[in-house]
A protein has these predicted regions:
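Acidic, S/T/G-rich, low-cysteine, solvent-exposed domains in lumenal/extracellular/periplasmic regions
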Residues: 163, 174, 190-498
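Juxtamembrane amphipathic/hinge helix adjacent to a transmembrane helix
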Residues: 492-520
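C-terminal signal-anchor/stop-transfer transmembrane helix together with its immediate cytosolic
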Residues: 1-32, 511-554
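A short, polar/proline- and glycine-enriched secondary-structure boundary/capping micro-motif
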Residues: 148-151, 389, 462-463, 511-513
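Short linear, low-complexity motifs centered on an aromatic residue
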Residues: 180-182, 313-315, 551
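Glycine- and acidic
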Residues: 27, 60, 184, 278-279, ...
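Intrinsically disordered or highly flexible coil/loop and linker segments, enriched in small
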Residues: 51, 178, 306, 426, ...
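Juxtamembrane extramembrane loops of integral membrane proteins
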Residues: 4-244, 248-251, 269
């Protein structure tokens, strides 16, 4: 019995270890980029589930190598999700179009050139359907960013898989839709020009529009005081392209809303101009736009400058180059006042996002130094920009500017801020017309703000009374990432669970050299097939020789 004791001990230890791992499995992600790990925010969200979750994967069929990689990564993400929380995930693939058509999902057509020179066409549905407690959510697996190659888009899609599934699960778990408010009363764009913005936000929020001005008369003829808590029911407030100044009461209400932890998206221009005058006369003067917000924003940590940026990387506009008014000849010409903005890869708001379309944008400076506010540039110009100060003039004839004047690089036009802010009313009296039962708050709870140097980024154009998509240029037919920017900005402002940070996940893209792979193809095939057999043959031969010599001695 003692002879077999070590073996019994080893077998017993193995069985105990196996039983322990069955009850409490240990998962160890040894990849550099933690590709197979979920964040703590995702684990917490999954543990909150109290009913089974069913996932139907529609990405199936005759897929190329890139989409097979995306499918495998999706299955791995779903498998990892199944480890945490009270849930049961099922993976099913469907090739038919009945389910897809019922949900209005559009397929992606892939054209690939085969080795014989022919072009093959494949239709795929890069979607997954998530069901929880009778509710459904569509998860889009493929993120198609303009300007990126196919491999880069697939890699970006893999990076965003965890966020895509967690976002869908968060929406399915949500019992009450959070509310956001768009402020009015200062010449802001009408609902027709914010239609697509409201449509994009309606997936996540209930969107209200309202006026803060205390204009309702009382019986005594005075205005009715406005309660300082009027905005407290909203997760975030949007100030989009105002044209007239804010009153002292409105400024105070917004300031104290921020002090109580409210989040604000400011999309304000530093310059006053007239697009109508530009279209009818061919030019418009540009002057500083006085909104009464300069001191507030400066106190919070940024300054929207009374100037406009110009950029060589810009949208074209149709211009009549014909001298004959009876025979117009419209040609696309670069319009430097409509810059195509670069997005920062260092923020979860703009990571893996394409360019953002804009017109008449003011530059933004970060101020305050060591004020404890974390500031990140979200949008910036290209490496060939210039800044036009006010007062000045914008002229349509200025379509061939001096290229040597574009000396600025990466001018910030959108900045995010997070931290504890100082009140703009810290050492001032409370304005008249305010109803409040508490003293002025001088410092805020930890909160977030975003400042954008133009309202155009969040607006859509209209054509024949119909709203066009946000970020769509009707002259070139190109679609930019304005819609994603708006949605991600609001998700970041209102994110208390840390889910938006999942967009910062990075997966290293390790690509083969296609040319070298083709040249070495036969060599690699020979080595991978013959070498293992040769090694086995050598080992087998050595074993036979050793055994033969051993038994010859006997």
């Amino acid at each position: 019995m003692k002879k077999y004791a070590p073996y019994i001990f080893i077998v017993g230890l193995f069985l105990c270890l196996y039983g322990t791992l069955q009850v409490r499995p240990i998962r160890w992600d040894m990849t550099d980029d933690k590709h197979y790990s979920l964040s703590e925010a995702s684990k917490a969200l999954l543990r909150q589930t109290d009913a089974p979750i069913e996932v139907t994967l529609l990405l199936d069929g005759d897929l190329n190598a890139g989409f097979r990689r995306l499918k495998k990564a999706t299955e791995e993400t779903i498998e990892e999700m199944g480890v945490y929380g009270n849930l049961s995930l099922t993976l099913r693939s469907r090739e038919g179009t009945k389910l897809q058509d019922s949900l209005g999902l559009r397929p992606i057509v892939i054209h690939e050139r085969e080795q014989n020179g022919k072009t093959a066409q494949t239709t795929v549905y890069p979607y997954a359907i998530m069901q929880y407690k009778g509710r459904k959510a569509v998860v889009t697996l493929l993120k198609n960013t303009r300007g990126l190659s196919g491999e880069e888009n697939l890699n970006a899609s893999i990076e965003q898989l965890e966020f895509a599934f967690m976002e869908a699960l968060h929406l399915l778990q949500q019992q009450e839709t959070p509310r956001v408010a768009i402020l009015e009363g200062h010449g802001e764009p009408d609902e027709a020009h914010t239609y697509d913005l409201m449509s994009a936000l309606s997936k996540y929020f209930a969107v209200d529009r309202g006026n803060l001005s205390p204009t309702l008369p009382s019986r005594e003829g005075d205005t009715v005081p406005v309660n300082v808590h009027i905005l407290d029911g909203y997760k975030a407030v949007l100030v989009i392209d105002p044209q007239t100044a804010f009153s002292e009461q409105e400024r105070f209400i917004i300031d104290q809303y921020i002090m109580r932890g409210g989040a604000v998206l400011w999309a304000v221009n530093g310059v006053r101009f007239s697009e109508q005058a530009l279209q009818s006369n061919g030019f418009t003067p540009i002057l500083p736009l006085e909104l009464g917000l300069t001191d507030m924003l400066f106190r919070y940590g940024v300054r929207v400058n009374p100037a406009l940026v110009q950029d060589i990387q810009c949208l074209p506009i149709p211009v009549n180059v014909s001298n004959d008014p009876q025979s117009p000849n419209l040609q696309p010409m670069p319009w430097t006042y409509a810059p195509l903005l670069l997005t920062s890869q260092g923020s979860p708001i703009t990571k893996n996002m394409g360019q953002v379309m804009s017109t008449f944008v003011s530059p933004i400076d970060a101020v305050g130094g060591e004020d404890g506010i974390e500031k990140r540039v979200l949008l910036a110009t290209s490496t060939a920009s210039r800044v036009t100060a006010t007062p000045g003039e914008v002229d349509l004839n200025d379509l061939n500017p001096d290229m040597t004047a574009f000396q600025y690089q990466y001018v910030p036009v959108a900045v995010s801020m997070e931290g504890v802010f100082q009140s703009a009313f810290a050492h001032r009296m409370m304005p008249e017309g305010i109803e409040s039962d508490e003293p002025i708050r001088k410092t805020s709870a930890r909160t977030r703000q975003i400042v954008v140097g133009s309202g155009s980024i969040l607006l859509n154009e209209t054509q024949k009374g119909q709203a066009l998509p946000m970020g769509y240029d009707r002259y070139s037919g190109m679609q930019f990432s304005n819609r994603d920017f708006a949605a991600n900005a609001l998700l970041w402002l209102t994110d208390s669970e840390g889910l938006i940070s999942l967009r910062e996940k990075s997966v290293v893209l390790r690509l083969l050299n296609d040319k070298r792979a083709h040249e070495k193809r036969v060599q690699v095939q020979v080595i991978s097939t013959i070498l293992p057999v040769a090694i086995l043959a050598i080992i087998g031969g050595i074993v036979l020789v050793v055994r033969k010599r051993k038994y010859e001695r006997v």
